[in-house]
Structure formats: C-alpha cells, structure tokens
Amino acid sequence: MHKVQLIIKLLLQLGIIIVITYIGTEIQKIFHLPLAGSIVGLFLFYLLLQFKIVPLTWVEDGANFLLKTMVFFFIPSVVGIMDVASEITLNYILFFAVIIIGTCIVALSSGYIAEKMSVKHKHRKGVDAYE
C-alpha cells in the first residue's frame, strides 16, 4: 500500500507541474509573448517557488523524477529530426555533431545546476550535502 501512496503523491506533484506549464502556455497565447509557453510556465513556476506560494515539498519528488528521466524526453526530438533528415541540406556529419554536442551541453548544464541547487537546499536544511 505504501508504494501506491508514493505513486499517487508523484502523480499529484507532476500534475501541479503540468498545470503550471499549461497556465504559462495560456498566458503566452493570451498576451502573444515572443517566448514559448513552456518557458513562460517555467518562469511562473520559479516565481511561485521563490515567493513560497507553491512550497518546494509540493513538487520536489515530481521534479526529481523529471530530472532523472530527462534523457527520455530528448528521444522524440531526435526521432522527429530523423523524419525530416532528407530535407536537411547541411553536411550530415556537422549537423549530427551539433545535435550531439548541444544535447550534451544541455544535459551537463542541467545536471550541474540541479546539483548546485541540491547542495544549496541541503545546506539550508543543515544536512551535510555530501552524505
């Protein structure tokens, strides 16, 4: 029964994140902002966390789950690129090198930022971050 509670908690936390992202998308549509709706949602999410309107405990496990499974979210992008590969007139080796390097940069920078935030968060709680 304990696993069921953890799954429900995770789904609720993911739901909160998805709703905030959806609200960001709607804000972008209404105000015709030159940013992607998901970026507006991310900024909104950041503000809600900063001003403690949404406590970190409400979304922490869901966010950690998304960070752990982030690599799977890049796969549809690569498959989509493969569908239009015949329309790409660039040097294929250069094109795929840029994709691989860009993906590595995003993954490494995301991991670095997440690690720094985790250490900072644990430091605030008074826990040794390297236990």
UniProtKB/Swiss-Prot annotation:
GO cellular component: plasma membrane
InterPro entries: Holin-like_CidA, LrgA/CidA
Membrane topology: Multi-pass membrane protein
GO biological process: cytolysis; killing of cells of another organism; programmed cell death
Key words, A-Z: Cell membrane, Cytolysis, Membrane, Transmembrane, Transmembrane helix
Subcellular location: Cell membrane
A Pfam cross-reference name: LrgA
Record field: transmembrane: 7-25, 30-49, 62-82, 92-114
Superkingdom of the source species: Bacteria
Similarity-based family: Belongs to the CidA/LrgA family. CidA subfamily.
Function summary: Increases the activity of extracellular murein hydrolases possibly by mediating their export via hole formation. Inhibited by the antiholin-like proteins LrgAB. In an unstressed cell, the LrgAB products probably inhibit the function of the CidAB proteins. When a cell is stressed by the addition of antibiotics or by other factors in the environment, the CidAB proteins possibly oligomerize within the bacterial cell membrane, creating lesions that disrupt the proton motive force, which in turn results in loss of cell viability.
Record protein name field: Holin-like protein CidA
Lineage: Bacteria, Bacillati, Bacillota, Bacilli, Bacillales
Gene giving rise to this polypeptide: cidA
